[in-house]
């Protein structure tokens, strides 16, 4: 590569080459050279959240008369450009880098410095952009900002959409009775609406967990600087920064109750990952129910038909598979894997600092994004338009001997068990067998064993 495509930069460790068109400086370049590990870069949403923090901090330092209006305005303008999605190609660093995320913090400082120095003379990445800050409080804060914004603006709306889709579908189907199943075996009947109400409740419970956690998640480590003591930061910096960010985003960010905890641990991230795990498990349950209900069309349950979205086999013509529930199950598996990684990473808080912050940032961001998309996909491409196969459902329901459970109070458990076995063995309806083995006539049995009535607690 031609020398003309590089420029020479210098830092405390000496000189090195930096691409001529790069907005970053020597510390970022050293990280680029040192951490050629993977193709996993710091998430875009995290970079934008970090820029939002720098924007708030520049304004706060100006309010506190620590930065000149000109420098603060230049820094804030550059940071806002990044927050709005510009210059993202200037953040090339691998997530597998220094565990504090110092490389990414300096990447941001250097890019903002470069952009700002075109507006005013000499905006220094450390002295001005990083004023009153340490990577040790900035990166944990950026993780919380990123997570909070994603939960509020993406995940919760997606979950609400999924819940509404479930509720609307249940309402449109109505009280169609079907075989209940426990242990994947025939059980007493339930209605579609009852079965789907469990799905809706799972999503609702998961939403409530996220909403409760937001109070903790919006506490920021900023202001604690290197070890939590706040050295080199104005005591009012964190509060003033949060005021600016809250006005812009509508969030409720505030300084952490304990800055030592906020820097040395990643408890809030671990709690968030636990919420992600709960939602992932719920989505797996719903998806697997849909897959089983859709199974067949001839050799399975065949209770519903999911929308046919694409050919299902490269060798079997006409085969159509439940691709959306399968996709969602894979999302859930990825989220569960991310949760385990986050758990291990959260254990790496030694004394005053956790040193796996970039990994936590990446996995949290990925999980939140995947879950948001999965909720939308499941709602719009599976639940919204599946069809109920009433003939199949009614046929299976009519031949379900477990309905004899409703006779327990009249004929006793032992007689009921004999009726069930006989009906199974002879492949006859429960009403036919019960009318032979009891004193109850067919009309009485039909009333007692009415599947619709059996779905109601009467």
Region spans (language model):
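Conserved, well-structured ligand/cofactor-binding cores
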Residues: 1-458
């Amino acid at each position: 590569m031609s020398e003309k495509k590089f420029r020479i930069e210098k830092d405390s460790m000496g000189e090195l080459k930096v691409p001529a068109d790069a907005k970053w400086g020597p510390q970022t370049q050293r990280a680029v050279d040192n951490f050629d590990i993977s193709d996993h870069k710091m998430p875009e949403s995290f970079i934008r959240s970090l820029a939002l923090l720098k924007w708030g901090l520049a304004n706060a330092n100006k309010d506190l008369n620590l930065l000149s209006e000109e420098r603060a305005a230049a820094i804030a303008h550059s940071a806002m450009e990044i927050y709005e999605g510009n210059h993202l190609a200037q953040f090339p660093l691998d997530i597998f880098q220094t565990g504090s995320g110092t490389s990414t913090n300096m990447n941001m400082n250097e890019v903002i410095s470069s952009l700002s120095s075109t507006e005013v003379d000499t905006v220094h990445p450390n002295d001005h952009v990083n004023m009153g800050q340490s990577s040790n409080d900035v990166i944990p804060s950026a993780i919380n900002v990123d997570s909070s914004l994603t939960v509020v603006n993406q995940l919760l709306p997606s979950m609400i959409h999924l819940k509404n889709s479930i509720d609307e579908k249940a309402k449109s189907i109505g009280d169609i009775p079907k075989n209940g199943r426990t242990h994947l075996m025939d059980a007493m009947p339930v209605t579609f609406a009852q079965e789907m109400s469990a799905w809706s409740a799972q999503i609702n419970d998961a939403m409530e967990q996220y909403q409760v956690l937001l109070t903790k998640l919006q506490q920021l480590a900023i202001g604690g600087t290197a070890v939590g003591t706040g050295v080199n930061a104005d005591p009012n910096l964190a509060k003033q920064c949060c005021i600016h960010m809250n006005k812009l985003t509508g969030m409720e960010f505030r300084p952490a109750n304990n800055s030592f905890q906020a820097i040395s641990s990643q408890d809030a991230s671990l709690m968030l990952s636990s919420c992600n795990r709960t939602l992932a498990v719920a989505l797996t349950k719903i998806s697997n129910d849909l897959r089983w209900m859709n199974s067949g069309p001839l050799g399975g349950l065949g209770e519903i038909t999911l929308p046919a979205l694409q050919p299902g086999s490269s060798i079997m013509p006409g085969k159509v598979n439940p691709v959306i529930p399968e996709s969602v199950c894979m999302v859930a598996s990825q989220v569960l894997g991310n949760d385990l990684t986050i758990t291990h990473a959260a254990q790496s808080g030694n004394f005053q600092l956790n040193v796996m912050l970039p990994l936590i940032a990446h996995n949290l961001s990925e999980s939140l994004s995947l879950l948001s998309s999965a909720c939308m996909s499941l709602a719009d491409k599976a639940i919204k338009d599946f069809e109920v196969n009433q003939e199949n459902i009614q046929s299976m329901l009519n031949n379900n001997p477990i309905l004899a459970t409703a006779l327990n109070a009249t004929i006793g458990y032992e007689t009921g068990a004999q009726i069930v076995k006989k009906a199974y063995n002879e492949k006859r309806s429960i009403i036919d067998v019960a009318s032979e083995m009891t004193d109850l006539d067919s009309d009485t049995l039909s009333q007692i064993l009415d599947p619709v009535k059996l779905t109601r607690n009467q």
